[in-house]
Design a protein with these regions (language model features):
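Juxtamembrane intracellular "pre-TM" segments in multi-pass secondary transporters
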Residues: 8-20, 191-228
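Helix-loop boundary and gating motifs at the non-cytosolic
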Residues: 13-66, 217-255
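Hydrophobic core of transmembrane alpha-helices in multi-pass small-molecule transporters
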Residues: 31, 100, 110-128, 225, ...
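Helix-to-loop junctions at the C-terminal end of transmembrane segments
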Residues: 71-85, 168-169, 265-278
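Conserved MFS/SLC helix-loop-helix module at the cytosolic interface between two early adjacent transmembrane helices
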Residues: 71-105
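Structural signature of the two symmetry-related core transmembrane helices
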Residues: 88-102, 281-296
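Cytoplasmic helix-loop-helix junction between adjacent transmembrane helices
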Residues: 117-152
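Symmetry-related core transmembrane helices of the 12-TM Major Facilitator Superfamily/SLC fold
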Residues: 175-192
C-alpha cells in the first residue's frame, strides 16, 4: 500500500493509518504560520517605533500588509485553480516571503519599507487561503474537525508571543526581524510536506456578481469588512499604546496571548456548538463579544 500517494486524498478521519501523518503535516503549517504572525502582530509595530518610524508611517506600513489581502488571495486562488498546483502555490508563497523579508533588518527608511512589506504580504497572503483549501479537501465530509487542526495555529501564536516577550525584554526589540525570519523558515519547511490535494467539490458556474448580491453573502461580507475595520488600529497601535502606558514587553505578550487562549477554547468546542446553536447565532454572538472587547479596552 502506497501511503504517501494518498496521504491528502479523501477523508483522513476514515483512514486511521494515514491520520497521524496527515494531522501532523497540516497542523505543523498552521503552527509555524501563526507563530510567524505571533512574532509580527504584537512586535513589528514596536520594532518600527524603535526604528523611529512615525505613527503615520507605521499605520501606512501596517495598512499595506492588510491591503494586499484584497487582491493577492484572489489572484493566487485563480492561479491555483487554473494550474491545479495548489501545493506549489503554497510552497512558492512561503519561500518568497522568506527571501523578501531577509532584507527587512537592513531597511531604515519609510518608502523602501513600504515596498518590502507590499511584496512580502503579497506572497504571505497567498499561502493561508490555499492551505485552507487543502485542509478542507483533506477532511472531506468531516469538515467539522477542522478546528482540531486549526487550534495548533493558535498554540503557535501563543508560544511565539510569550517566548518573544522574554527575548525582547532580555535582548531588545531589534531582534524581532530575525525572529520573524526564523519562523518564516520553519513555515516554508512545513510546506514541503504538503501534497497535491484532490478537490472533490463540484463548482457551479456562476458570475461573481450573482454570488455577491445574495443577501446572505452580502451580509457576511459587510460584517467581515466592519470586523476587519475595527481590528486595523488594534493591530497597528495596541502594542505601542501599551508600551507608552508603561507596560513591559512581558506583560504585552501575556495580554496578546489571552485572546488567543480564548480562541483555542472556542476551537475545542465549536464542532459541537455548530449543530446545537447554528452558525447564524454563533456569528451574532461573536460580534457582540467583539463589541464588548473594544468597550473594555
Amino acid at each position: 500500500m502506497n501511503k504517501d500517494k494518498n496521504i491528502y486524498k479523501g477523508n483522513i478521519l476514515d483512514a486511521p493509518i494515514m491520520l497521524d501523518r496527515s494531522y501532523i503535516h497540516l497542523s505543523s503549517f498552521y503552527f509555524f504560520y501563526f507563530a510567524s504572525l505571533g512574532a509580527f502582530l504584537p512586535y513589528w509595530p514596536l520594532y518600527l517605533s524603535y526604528k523611529s518610524f512615525t505613527a503615520y508611517e507605521i499605520g501606512i506600513i501596517t495598512g499595506t500588509m492588510i491591503g494586499t489581502k484584497i487582491i493577492a488571495p484572489n489572484l493566487w486562488g485563480w492561479i491555483a485553480d487554473k494550474t491545479g498546483l495548489r501545493h506549489r502555490v503554497i510552497q512558492f508563497g512561503a519561500l518568497s516571503c522568506l527571501l523578501i523579508f531577509m532584507f527587512a533588518p537592513q531597511i531604515e527608511n519609510f518608502y523602501p519599507m513600504v515596498l518590502l512589506i507590499f511584496f512580502f504580504s503579497f506572497f504571505w497572503n497567498a499561502s493561508l487561503p490555499q492551505f485552507e483549501a487543502v485542509t478542507m479537501n483533506t477532511l472531506g465530509s468531516s469538515y467539522n474537525k477542522y478546528s482540531q487542526i486549526r487550534l495548533w495555529g493558535s498554540l503557535g501564536f501563543i508560544l511565539s508571543v510569550l517566548i518573544l516577550s522574554f527575548f525582547t525584554s532580555k535582548y531588545g526589540i531589534n531582534i524581532i526581524p530575525y525572529c520573524i525570519l526564523f519562523f518564516l523558515f520553519l513555515t516554508w519547511v512545513s510546506t514541503l510536506y504538503v501534497k497535491k490535494a484532490e478537490d472533490n467539490t463540484k463548482a457551479e458556474s456562476s458570475s461573481l456578481l450573482t454570488i455577491i448580491i445574495k443577501p446572505a453573502v452580502l451580509g457576511i461580507l459587510i460584517s467581515c469588512f466592519l470586523m476587519q475595520l475595527s481590528h486595523g488600529p488594534f493591530y497597528a497601535f495596541f502594542a505601542i499604546y501599551l508600551t507608552e502606558n508603561s507596560y513591559s514587553t512581558n506583560l504585552i505578550g501575556v495580554i496578546w496571548s489571552l485572546g488567543v487562549i480564548a480562541e483555542i477554547l472556542i476551537f475545542m468546542k465549536i464542532s459541537s456548538w455548530i449543530p446545537k446553536y447554528g452558525l447564524k447565532n454563533l456569528f451574532i454572538i461573536s460580534f457582540l463579544f467583539a463589541t464588548l472587547r473594544w468597550l473594555l479596552i
